[in-house]
From Swiss-Prot:
The active site is at 213. It comes from Paenibacillus lautus. This is Endoglucanase A. PROSITE patterns: CBM3. Gene3D superfamilies: Endoglucanase-like, Glycosidases, Golgi alpha-mannosidase II. Residues 1-33 form the signal peptide. SUPFAM superfamilies: (Trans)glycosidases, Carbohydrate-binding domain, Glycosyl hydrolase domain. Keywords: Carbohydrate metabolism, Cellulose degradation, Glycosidase, Hydrolase, Polysaccharide degradation, Signal. The gene is celA.
C-alpha cells in the first residue's frame, strides 16, 4: 500500500463486467433496536488470542500500545538496505530518494549508514515491546541512488538500480560494498542478526515479509518490474528468498506473498499463464500454498510460516466504497459497520462486486483457513494491511473494533492497520479499546472464550479472560445501530461468580475513551446494561474475590492518624516483610490502599518518611469500583529503593494523602482503613503485587 490511493486493475472479463453491474442494497439497519441478549461461557471455545493482531504500519498517536509493527508498503519494494535509498514508483513520479529515512525518524547524518531505516524501525519496536515484520526485496532491483525521478529510459537494468540477489554465496560483510551493483538479502539478514540476535532471542527481528503486493509490481513499480508477474515466477522467488533467510536465521518467520486484494487472491491479477496452471485449484492462493508445501518437502524445512494477505474491503453503500473516501454518506457509514461480517458470517452478503460475482469465496477468513488446511496445514494467517475507512468517524471506530474482535475470535495470527486518512482519532480509539482502555496500557484478555449475540446486525460481542483462573472477564460490546440504544442482557456461565464490573468506551459524541457507569446489578451471573447508539464498550468483570498466589511477602499496616477518621488527611503507614529465602527487588512491587474520596476532587499524596527513602517511592491514584472504595493509592518503587533481604523488611513507609481542595474525608467506610490498628499488624485489606500479580491481600 502507498500513501496515496492506488489503482485496482481487474482485467478479466468477469471482473470488468462486474464493476458495471447494479447490486441490490443491503437490508436497512435503522429499524428500532430490540432488546439484545449476550451469552458468554468462559469454559467453552477457549483458545489463545495471538498478541500480534493489534498491529500497525504507522504509529498514529503513539498511545495505542501496538503489539506488532510492520515495515512495509510500496516503498519497500525498491528499498536498498545498503544506503537506505528507495523508490516511490508510480505513487510519486518514480522518485528515488531518502524518503524512508525522514519517514522513519533517521537523522540525516545516519541516512547513508547500512540498514539505518530497518534498525531505527526495530529499535522502536523493541522500545514498545512490539513484534517486528521487516519487508525484504524480491522484485529484482532496488534504488542505487537518491537522485530523484527515474525516466522510463532508465528502467532496470540501468545505472539507477542495483540488482537484488537473494544469496551472496560468499563471506558476509557488515559494511557492504556500495559500488558492486549487487544487494544481497541474506547479507542484510546477517547484518540484523549480528546487531540484534536471531529471532529466537528477546531482541531479534521475528519475521520477514517476501516483498509487498507482487501482483501489482508492473503497475506500482514499472521501472523495476515492467512485465506482469507470472505465478511460477512468484513461487520461485518466494522459495529462493525464504531459503536464503532461513539459512541465516532458521528461527525467523516468513510472511508471504503479501497479496494486495481479491484480484490477486483469485488469479494473481490475471497473471499470464495462470489458466494453464490453475487445474483444480479454486484460486491462486491454493496453488501458492501447495507449491510452498512441496518446497518444504523437498528442502526439509518450512519456507512459508504465515500466509499474508491485505484486505481493503470493496463493500460500498450509497454508491461509495467504504475505504479511500472518508466517512462517506449515511449509507456508506451503515455499510462500513456491517462490512466486518464478510470476514466470518456466511449469512451476510456485502454490496460489492465480490459479493455479487464471487460470493462463494466469502466469508473470507474461513475460506483462507480452508485453503491452508487443505494445501499447507500448520501455516498461520496474517492480514498485514487493512482499513475500514472512516478513520475519523464513529463508523470507522466501530468497524475497526469489530474486526479486531473477529481476528482474535477466529484465530488470525497477525494483523496490521494501514492508514488511509490524515485524521485517525476513531481508529486509534478502537485499538486503545483493546490495548490501552484505561490509559495505563491495560488490555483485553489473552484467552478468548465463547461469546454470542442474539442480533448480529445491530451488535457484536467478544469475550476473553486473562488467565486460567477466569478471575477477570473482559467483554467488548458494540452497538452498531445508528438511532437506538440497546437494552442488553448479559448471561454469564462458567466456574466463577462475577460480582462487579467497570466499563470504558467511546461513542458518536467523541473518540476519547472514558469510564462509564459501573456495573453493580449482577445477580447469579446475569445483568443488564444500556448501550447508546453507535457505541463501543470494554467491560471488565471481577469474580467474587481475587485471592493472592502463595507468597512469602506480607504487608503490615497501622493507622498513623490515631483513628481521626473525619479530618482532611489520610495517613496509612506500611511495612513490607519478606519471609522467604531469597531477596525481593522492591522495583518489582506495587502496593495499593483502597478508600472512598467522598467527593470528586483530585488527590495529592506525600511520603512523610520512609526508611528506604521517600524519593524512591512514586505515588499514583486510580479509580476503583468495589466494596467501600472508589479510589486507590498506589505506591511504586524505583530501582534506588533496593531490595528486601530474605527474612527482612522494607522498614516503615509513612503515606499521607489529601484532596486538592482540602475537604474532609469519612474514613469509617473505607475498605483499607482500621483506626483500631495503632501498631503494625498483618493486614490483608492492603494489596501487594509483584510484577503485576497479586501476592498479598484481598482486592475489594
Amino acid at each position: 500500500m502507498k500513501t496515496r490511493q492506488r489503482k485496482r486493475l481487474f482485467v478479466s472479463a468477469a471482473l470488468a463486467v462486474s464493476l458495471t453491474m447494479t447490486v441490490p442494497m443491503p437490508a436497512s439497519v435503522n429499524a428500532a433496536a430490540s432488546d439484545v441478549t449476550f451469552t458468554i461461557n468462559t469454559q467453552s471455545e477457549r483458545a489463545a488470542i495471538s498478541p500480534n493482531i493489534y498491529g500497525t504500519n504507522q504509529d498514529l498517536s503513539g498511545t495505542e500500545n501496538w503489539s506488532s509493527r510492520r515495515l512495509g508498503g510500496n516503498r519497500l519494494t525498491g528499498y536498498n538496505w545498503e544506503n537506505n535509498a528507495s523508490s516511490a514508483g508510480r505513487d510519486w513520479l518514480h522518485y528515488s530518494d531518502d524518503f524512508l529515512c525522514g519517514n522513519g525518524g533517521v537523522p540525516d547524518t545516519d541516512c547513508d549508514k547500512p540498514g539505518a531505516v530497518v534498525t531505527a524501525f526495530h529499535d522502536k519496536s523493541l522500545e514498545n515491546g512490539a513484534y517486528s515484520i521487516v519487508t525484504l526485496q524480491m522484485a529484482g532491483y532496488v534504488s542505487r541512488d537518491k537522485n530523484g525521478p527515474v525516466d522510463e529510459s532508465e528502467t532496470a537494468p540501468s545505472p539507477r538500480w542495483d540488482k537484488v540477489e537473494f544469496a551472496k554465496n560468499a563471506p558476509f560483510s557488515l559494511q557492504p560494498h556500495l559500488n558492486d551493483g549487487q544487494v544481497y538479502m541474506d547479507e542484510e539478514v546477517n547484518f540484523l542478526v549480528n546487531r540484534y540476535g536471531n529471532a529466537s532471542t528477546s531482541t531479534g527481528i521475528k519475521a520477514y515479509s517476501l516483498d509487498n503486493e507482487p501482483a501489482l509490481w508492473s503497475e506500482t513499480h514499472p521501472r523495476i518490474h515492467p512485465e506482469q508477474l507470472q505465478a511460477a515466477e512468484l513461487v520461485a522467488k518466494s522459495i529462493d528468498l525464504s531459503k536464503a533467510v532461513k539459512n541465516v536465521d532458521p528461527h525467523a518467520e516468513i510472511f508471504g506473498p503479501a497479496l494486495y486484494g481479491f484480484g490477486a487472491y483469485l488469479s494473481l491479477q490475471d497473471a499470464p499463464g495462470w489458466p494453464s496452471l490453475q487445474g483444480n485449484y479454486s484460486w491462486f492462493i491454493d496453488y501458492y500454498l501447495d507449491q510452498m508445501k512441496n518446497a518444504h518437502t523437498q528442502n526439509g524445512k518450512r519456507l512459508l510460516d504465515v500466509l499474508d494477505v491485505h484486505w481493503y474491503p470493496e463493500a460500498q453503500g450509497g454508491g461509495q466504497r467504504i475505504v479511500f473516501g472518508g466517512a462517506g454518506n449515511i449509507d456508506t457509514q451503515k455499510a462500513r459497520v456491517q462490512a466486518p461480517r464478510s470476514l466470518w458470517d456466511p449469512a451476510y452478503q456485502e454490496d460489492s462486486w465480490i459479493g455479487t460475482w464471487f460470493s462463494s469465496y466469502l466469508p473470507l477468513i474461513p475460506k483462507l483457513q480452508s485453503s491452508i488446511q487443505t494445501y499447507y496445514p500448520g501455516t498461520k494467517l496474517a492480514i498485514t494491511e487493512s482499513s475500514y475507512g472512516g478513520d475519523n468517524h464513529i463508523s470507522g471506530g466501530i468497524a475497526t473494533a469489530d474486526a479486531l474482535g473477529i481476528f482474535g475470535k477466529y484465530g488470525v495470527y497477525a494483523a496490521n492497520y494501514w492508514q488511509t486518512e490524515d485524521n485517525t482519532d476513531y481508529t486509534s480509539a478502537a485499538y486503545k479499546l483493546y490495548r490501552n482502555y484505561d490509559g495505563n496500557k491495560s488490555g483485553f484478555g489473552s484467552i478468548k472464550v465463547d461469546a454470542a449475540t442474539s442480533d448480529t446486525e445491530n451488535s457484536s460481542v467478544y469475550a476473553s479472560v486473562t488467565d486460567e483462573e477466569n478471575s477477570e472477564l473482559h467483554l467488548i460490546v458494540l452497538n452498531k445501530n445508528f438511532d437506538d440504544p440497546i437494552n442488553a442482557t448479559f448471561q454469564l456461565s462458567g466456574d466463577k461468580t462475577y460480582t462487579s464490573g467497570r466499563v470504558w468506551g467511546f461513542d458518536q459524541t467523541g473518540s476519547d475513551i472514558t469510564e462509564q457507569a459501573a456495573i453493580t446489578n449482577i445477580n447469579n451471573n446475569q445483568f443488564t446494561y444500556t448501550l447508546p447508539p453507535l457505541s463501543a464498550y470494554h467491560i471488565v468483570l471481577k469474580a467474587d474475590s481475587t485471592e493472592p498466589v502463595n507468597s512469602d511477602l506480607v504487608v503490615q499496616y497501622k493507622d498513623g492518624d490515631r483513628n481521626n477518621a473525619t479530618d482532611n488527611q489520610i495517613k496509612p503507614h506500611f511495612n513490607i516483610q519478606n519471609k522467604g529465602t531469597s531477596p525481593v527487588d522492591l522495583s518489582s512491587l506495587t502496593l495499593r490502599y483502597y478508600f472512598t474520596k467522598d467527593s470528586s476532587a483530585a488527590m495529592n499524596g506525600w511520603i512523610d518518611w520512609a526508611k528506604l527513602g521517600g524519593s524512591n517511592i512514586q505515588i499514583s491514584f486510580g479509580n476503583h469500583n468495589g466494596a467501600d472504595s472508589d479510589t486507590y493509592a498506589e505506591l511504586g518503587f524505583s530501582s534506588g529503593a533496593g531490595s528486601i533481604a530474605e527474612g527482612g523488611q522494607s522498614g516503615e513507609i509513612q503515606l499521607r494523602m489529601s484532596k486538592a481542595d482540602w475537604s474532609n474525608f469519612n474514613e469509617a467506610n473505607d475498605y483499607s482503613f482500621d483506626g483500631a490498628k495503632t501498631a503494625y499488624i498483618d493486614w490483608d485489606r492492603v494489596t501487594l503485587y509483584q510484577d503485576g500479580q497479586l501476592v498479598w491481600g484481598i482486592e475489594p
